Each structure stands twice: as structure tokens, then as C-alpha cells.
Amino acid sequence: MGQGDESERIVINVGGTRHQTYRSTLRTLPGTRLAWLAEPDAHSHFDYDPRADEFFFDRHPGVFAHILNYYRTGKLHCPADVCGPLYEEELAFWGIDETDVEPCCWMTYRQHRDAEEALDSFGGAPLDNSADDADADGPGDSGDGEDELEMTKRLALSDSPDGRPGGFWRRWQPRIWALFEDPYSSRYARYVAFASLFFILVSITTFCLETHERFNPIVNKTEIENVRNGTQVRYYREAETEAFLTYIEGVCVVWFTFEFLMRVVFCPNKVEFIKNSLNIIDFVAILPFYLEVGLSGLSSKAAKDVLGFLRVVRFVRILRIFKLTRHFVGLRVLGHTLRASTNEFLLLIIFLALGVLIFATMIYYAERIGAQPNDPSASEHTHFKNIPIGFWWAVVTMTTLGYGDMYPQTWSGMLVGALCALAGVLTIAMPVPVIVNNFGMYYSLAMAKQKLPKKKKKHIPRPPQLGSPNYCKSVVNSPHHSTQSDTCPLAQEEILEINRAGRKPLRGMSI
């Protein structure tokens, strides 16, 4: 081997594992950290050991093997035994764009990010329901300022950026907000959640009982009407709900009103509160009761019309069932699954619409094949007198319900019915596994977040210092600042990070 080949060879020690390659290989990706190792003055810019003739980096050796192979082959693959965030950090350190990951490994690389987005989508209330934390904390038992700030940030935007208690409002606002919003924030929050759950169940039970004949006796009523020359008494009969059910509903509404007002007053972010669909449901379910009580004493015709309309829209009370999503993880998982599977549901609707249109048309003409000459409309021997009627039959058949109110009576119609049933099974079976997988993913993430131990303190890594082995000093020492190949963007980012840390030094860190 010639002397020129020896001078082109370079040794890189990453985490105790030595890697050998050629400088020409490192030059294939200019502007990256490894490309700077191929420069003549790299010995003064990185941690170089002249005795071992190697550069040292205290990084993950297994990930570096894949990164070095990217320089050799031009294809960047993601190791299956490395967590996604770790691989992402290594790519950022070596200055490699994540979009260079091969398509075969992109799903593996994106898996961790999708999981993080799924966890973040669960929103404010944490899924950690540790009994020890619940018993230890209360609205008056708070931890340090960091715990209060973290709790407030989880639930909404904080009015106190520094998280320090300063006054009655700043101290009690996040606690009372968590008391009514986060059932797992404290022991007393659990009591409030149990009370809310009890009133929800009582209200829904009362709503259902009000429709039973046993609780709606028929009473005789009289009404005096004004006529041209006097008055006229009109007798009529009307179903009237038992009074005790109205009283029970009134007690439930009083609790819901108190809960809603407390959440409105102590909400840190009023705009986000108004946009929340559950809060809109709470308001819509409460309002008709007060309007009905206020208008029940009026005798005008307009008031009676409005009162009759309010009695019709009592069904909005059933929407309170959605309040249970605050207390049950499974319901939240189902909601996130439905939102995440919107594309699959749209695809299913499109497939069903196409199938309904096709088979409704086919069954209409198939049933007309056997029509008698004296019955040109085929109304005597078939239920399918037109195509729109066939839409109902096609929907029932493709969804495998089969009510039996409409069915084909000719051999050609039976053949179309069989094809319609088979097509419906295949159409529904295609998007269902995707929806089931989404539910399984969200449920596993919810269980993982529920069992995740509470982190007391978060370690803040020390920023790279000037002269550090992992610090790229090319921007400081190199006289070239003109092109991307002569400028180290990684060093620029690290210098900006040091400058930011120098302007606002962190506790326990020396700059």
C-alpha cells in the first residue's frame, strides 16, 4: 500500500469504538461535521490524539456506524434497536438532514414522533392516576413552584410565566382550575369528579324516565280564551311530568351551573375554554332548563310557543354523556381514534356510496326483467319500483343488516343481492383494520402514559463549552467564512446557544 493511501485513511473513535475510512469518503457530504474532519486543519478543531492518530467523539457508536455507511453507500438507514429520539439527536449532531432517511426506514424513524404527537393530543388532563400522588396532594397541599407551573402548563396557558406564588389569585387560580378540570391532580379533585359523575348519571336517568308513561300521567286542564264578545273556557288533556323528576333535574342543573361557573372564572385561557367542544355542550345542556323555568309562568302565546320548543329540544341534555370523557381514559381514546381515522371513514363512505349507487341501479333493472306484459312498471311482483327506493335496500344489504322489508323476487335480482352482500363485506373490511390499529395505538399510549412515573426533576444538559472535545471550533479559528463548505453551521448554532445561556445563566451552570 502506498504512502498516499495511508495519508488518506482516517480513524474516528466514537464512544470507544474505532472506525476507519478514507477522507474522500467523508467529503461526499460537504457541510457536515464529518466532512470537516477531512480538512487539513481538522487536528486543531476537534479532539485529536496524535499518539493513536484518531479523532474522538463521545457519541453513540452504534448509530455512528449507520451514519458512516451513509457516507459510503449514499443510503441512510435507521437501526431498529435504537429509539427514535436518540437517532434524531445523533443526526442533528453530525449535521445530517432527516429527510435523507430511506423510504424503507422512514416509518420506523417517524414512529417515535407519531407516538409523541399522539401523547400530546390527549391534551390537558394527565393520565397519571397514581394513588399515592392523589392521596398526598390536595387543593391546599402544593409542591414547589415547578410542580405548580408544570400542572398549569398541562392544563392551559399560565398567567404567571415564572410560576412563583405571588398573591391570592396567582396562588389559588391554578389549584382551583385543576380541582374542576383535572380529576387526577389531587384527592379533592377526585371527590369533585365523583360528584360530577354522580350528577351526570342521575341527570341522564331522569331524562330517560321522563319519557315513560308511568311518570307522565294524563291530567285535565282548562284554558280561558278571549273571543269576540267575551271569554270561552276550553277543556283539554295533557301529559304532565311528575314533579319530583323536575326537582331532581333542577338539583343536577344547579351543580352543573356551579361547576361551569367555577371553570369559567378560574380558567387561565378564556379563549381556549370557549373553543372547547365539551364546554359548549355544558352550556347548551344547561341553558334550556333556565329558559323553561323562566317562561313557564308566562301566559302569552309567544311564551307558550317557545316553551313548547324548549320541551322538544330537551334531548340536548343527553349530550352530558360526553362529559364522561374527562373521567374515563377509554372514552378519550375512542374520541382520538375517531379523529385520527377521519380519512378512513371518508374512504368508507365513498366506497359505500359507490356501491349503493351501482347495486340500486342493478337491482332495479334486474327486477324488471321478469315483468309481465300487462305490468310494464313491474309494481305487482317487485318492491323496487324506482332506483331511489333501491338505495335503502343497498345500504341495508351492504352493511349486512338485512331488515327484510325489501327483497328481490327474481333469479336475476337474487344474483344482484348476493353480489351486493359480498361487496359490502369487502368494502367494510378494508378500512376497519386501520381504525382498529389506531385505537390499539392510542390505547397503548394512554396506558403507557398512565403508568409513567412522575418525574421530579428534569436534567438540563450542559451546553458545549469553548474547547470542548465535541465542540466544532471551525467558525472561531478558521479564517474562511465565505461558502458553506468552509463554514461550520453546527459551530454557529452552538455559539448562539452559548450566547443565549450567557445572557440568562441557568442555575448550577457555569459559563
From Swiss-Prot:
Pfam families: BTB_2, Ion_trans
SMART domains: BTB
UniProt membrane topology term: Multi-pass membrane protein
Biased composition (Acidic residues): 130-147
Name used for this protein in its record: Voltage-gated potassium channel KCNC1
Record-stated family: Belongs to the potassium channel family. C (Shaw) (TC 1.A.1.2) subfamily. Kv3.1/KCNC1 sub-subfamily.
CDD domains: BTB_KCNC1_3
Sites bearing Phosphothreonine, chain numbering: T483
Disrupted gene: phenotype observed: Mutant mice are born at the expected Mendelian rate. They are viable and fertile, but have lower body weight than wild-type. They have normal spontaneous locomotor activity, but impaired motor skills. Mice lacking both Kcnc3 and Kcnc1 are born at the expected Mendelian rate, but the pups do not thrive and all die about 26 days after birth when kept together with other littermates. Their failure to thrive may be due to motor problems; mutant pups survive when fed separately, but 45 days after birth their body weight is only 50 to 60 % of that of wild-type.
Localization: Cell membrane; Cell projection, Axon; Presynaptic cell membrane
MF terms (GO), sorted A to Z: delayed rectifier potassium channel activity; kinesin binding; metal ion binding; transmembrane transporter binding; voltage-gated monoatomic ion channel activity involved in regulation of presynaptic membrane potential; voltage-gated potassium channel activity
Reaction(s) the record says it catalyses: K(+)(in) = K(+)(out)
Residues at which Zn(2+) binds: H77, C83, C104, C105
